[in-house]
């Protein structure tokens, strides 16, 4: 059967290493007791084949590429109606899943961050994600405070998920090979059903802090209307990258007068 042509505008790089594909699928731990798994951007099904061998969950795949969809239907007839031709970013995931489900994929680099922000929107339904990203992006998501790659996305994602960097993937195991290495990470939903601070204010404080990441919080937070707070407190001598997620919660409450 003729292979699917990788399309540059879709950010497609097809993984062709079977052991790495198996290792990615093995990254799923069933954290959160889900019974459904959604694979985003399956391409030619290198991950799909291993997902279908696992009887612990039921697999669906979604791809925006019509050529890939037709290929998958022929190669994996057992998927039947579980091959979805659509745009994950535009879909209402509750239409596909009334209950919990995990997400896995070799994510297109050009939309990988958007995928995880959509995951945040459905965080009560998605207890686990295993995904491949550009290495520097994967490292940023998993970074802890004090690391130069720690940033806005690190904090916002880690407010709701525990993130673990699993392994690095070299360029040559893809067709076509990307120009950078890739990294696989796993996100596991933590126990926070609600943040211990106002969510909108938290997002605002995090973004303001990192938008001027080289400056101390005393200067970086000037864009926020801070009232009745002494800016002489030691925390304002720090830069955003030095604060843990919990310290951002505390800072948000402090600035909100709570």
Swiss-Prot record:
GO cellular component: cytosol
Transmembrane parts of this sequence: none
UniProt keyword Transcription, yes or no: no
CDD domains listed in its UniProt record: AdoMet_MTases
Compartments, record wording: Cytoplasm
EC number, as in UniProt: 2.1.1.182
Positions of S-adenosyl-L-methionine binding: 13, 15, 41, 63, 87, 106
Keywords of this entry: Cytoplasm, Methyltransferase, RNA-binding, rRNA processing, S-adenosyl-L-methionine, Transferase
Pfam families: RrnaAD
GO MF term list: 16S rRNA (adenine(1518)-N(6)/adenine(1519)-N(6))-dimethyltransferase activity; RNA binding
Reaction it catalyzes: adenosine(1518)/adenosine(1519) in 16S rRNA + 4 S-adenosyl-L-methionine = N(6)-dimethyladenosine(1518)/N(6)-dimethyladenosine(1519) in 16S rRNA + 4 S-adenosyl-L-homocysteine + 4 H(+)
UniProt keyword annotation of Methyltransferase present: yes
SUPFAM superfamilies: S-adenosyl-L-methionine-dependent methyltransferases
Leading EC class: transferase
Main subcellular localisation: cytoplasm
Gene3D superfamilies the record matches: Ribosomal RNA adenine dimethylase-like, domain 2, Vaccinia Virus protein VP39
Family according to the record: Belongs to the class I-like SAM-binding methyltransferase superfamily. rRNA adenine N(6)-methyltransferase family. RsmA subfamily.
Function per UniProt: Specifically dimethylates two adjacent adenosines (A1518 and A1519) in the loop of a conserved hairpin near the 3'-end of 16S rRNA in the 30S particle. May play a critical role in biogenesis of 30S subunits.
PANTHER family in alphabetical order: DIMETHYLADENOSINE TRANSFERASE, DIMETHYLADENOSINE TRANSFERASE-RELATED
HAMAP family: 16SrRNA_methyltr_A (MF_00607)
Protein name as it appears in the record: Ribosomal RNA small subunit methyltransferase A
Organism: Cytophaga hutchinsonii (strain ATCC 33406 / DSM 1761 / CIP 103989 / NBRC 15051 / NCIMB 9469 / D465)
């Amino acid at each position: 059967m003729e292979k699917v042509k990788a399309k540059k505008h879709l950010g497609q790089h097809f993984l062709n290493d079977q052991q790495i594909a198996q290792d990615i699928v093995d990254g799923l731990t069933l954290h959160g007791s889900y019974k459904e798994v959604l694979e985003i951007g399956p391409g030619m099904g290198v991950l799909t084949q291993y997902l279908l061998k696992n009887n612990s969950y039921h697999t669906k795949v979604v791809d925006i590429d019509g050529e890939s969809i037709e290929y998958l239907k022929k190669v994996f007839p057992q998927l039947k109606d579980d091959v979805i031709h659509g745009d994950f970013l535009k879909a209402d995931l509750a239409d596909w899943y009334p209950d919990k489900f995990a997400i896995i994929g070799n994510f297109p680099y050009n939309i990988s961050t958007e995928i995880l922000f959509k995951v945040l929107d459905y965080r009560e339904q998605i207890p686990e994600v295993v995904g491949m990203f550009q290495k520097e992006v994967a490292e940023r998501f998993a970074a802890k405070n004090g690391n130069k790659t720690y940033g806005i996305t690190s904090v916002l994602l880690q407010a709701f998920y525990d993130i673990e960097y699993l392994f690095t993937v070299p360029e040559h195991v893809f067709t076509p090979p990307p120009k950078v290495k890739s990294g696989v990470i796993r996100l596991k939903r933590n126990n926070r059903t609600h943040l211990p601070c106002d969510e909108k204010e938290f997002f605002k404080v995090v973004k303001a802090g990192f938008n001027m990441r080289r400056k101390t919080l005393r200067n970086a937070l000037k864009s926020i209307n801070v009232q009745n707070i002494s800016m002489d407190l030691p925390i304002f001598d720090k830069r955003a990258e030095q604060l843990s997620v919990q310290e951002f919660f505390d800072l948000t409450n402090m600035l909100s007068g709570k």
